[in-house]
Amino acid sequence: MEANRGQVNHELSKLFNELWDADVNRMKAGKDYRISLQGKAGYVPARSNQAKDSASYPLFQFVDEEKLKSKKTFATFISLLDNYEMDTGVAEVVTPEEIAENNNFLDAILETKVMKMAHDYLVRKNQAKPSQNDFKVQLYSIWFQLYSRAPGSRPDSCGFEHVFVGESKRGKEMMGLHNWVQFYLQEKRKNIDYKGYVARQNKSRPDEDDQVLNLQFSWKEMVKPVGSSFIGVSPEFEFALYTIVFLASQAKMSREVIRLEEYELQIVVNRHGRYIGTAYPALLSTNNPDLY
């Protein structure tokens, strides 16, 4: 199956909207968190770490951390964020405690309606086995199995690290980090400096309750010219979308066009052999050659 590069996938649009409606753990804009978009980001060429700062303040003005950490899927997700070496080329060492944390997270998300619906869909498509335990083993492999991102190096990366945590290429170029919780926590620790928003072409600026945004920021001095992220959604929602797109195709790069709420998106998933290389939502009306 070739990756879909243009037409809207109506089957996945319907499914993903049902998953959106089922995402009871999603945090509510203006109530559970507040963002401040501020200025529009400037152009930054690829591999440049110089960016005009169009935002004097952090993106996240407020997050109800008590509520966030009271939700089991968020709490177990947050426990995974400090388990990785940032640089590719530096071998990852996975401790028994970290394996247990990975399993606790998968157990938590597999109890949600979102992941049960995703599992049911994949079983119907013969892309997952009916047993929840078999599905958990499959998810562990897709997301947490280590592989070498730098040629000739020891295993130094995995899908989860790239997408949800972020990593760097020789400390000079940042990669991944498409998750709002990690963005918030790194911003709170002063590791992330938000530079401004990248607007959709048909919209002069995003709204502060938008739940898909294109952002420019620096992370430990490395600039991300444009990084896209869902905002407020639960970890299980993102896991479900990216896993479904990954399993739907053997293509190296899958780009499924979907309509989700008010957004027209490409869900982009890059395959690293049998594992996820990267995954993110791309707002389709943003034509920027230096994305991601």
UniProtKB/Swiss-Prot annotation:
What is the name attached to this protein's record? Poly(U)-specific endoribonuclease-B
Extract the signal peptide range: none
Q: Which family does it belong to?
A: Belongs to the ENDOU family.
How does the record describe its quaternary structure? Monomer.
Q: Which residues form the EndoU domain?
A: 8-285
Superkingdom of origin? Eukaryota
Q: Tell me the keywords, alphabetical order.
A: Endonuclease, Hydrolase, Lyase, Manganese, Metal-binding, Nuclease, Nucleus, RNA-binding
Give the main EC class.
lyase
Annotated Gene Ontology MF terms? lyase activity; metal ion binding; RNA binding; RNA endonuclease activity
Kindly report the protein's main subcellular placement as a broad class: nucleus
Q: Which gene encodes it?
A: endou-b
UniProt catalytic activity: uridylyl-uridylyl-ribonucleotide-RNA = a 3'-end uridylyl-2',3'-cyclophospho-uridine-RNA + a 5'-end dephospho-ribonucleoside-RNA
Active site (catalytic residues): H162, H178, K224
Q: What is this protein's function?
A: Poly(U)-specific endoribonuclease involved in the processing of intron-encoded box C/D snoRNAs, such as U16 and U86. Releases products that have 2',3'-cyclic phosphate termini at the 3'-end.
GO cellular component entries? nucleus
- Which InterPro entries does its entry note? ENDOU, EndoU-like, EndoU_C
Q: Where, per UniProt, does this protein localize?
A: Nucleus
Q: Tell me its cofactors.
A: Mn(2+)
| Entry EC no(s) | 4.6.1.-
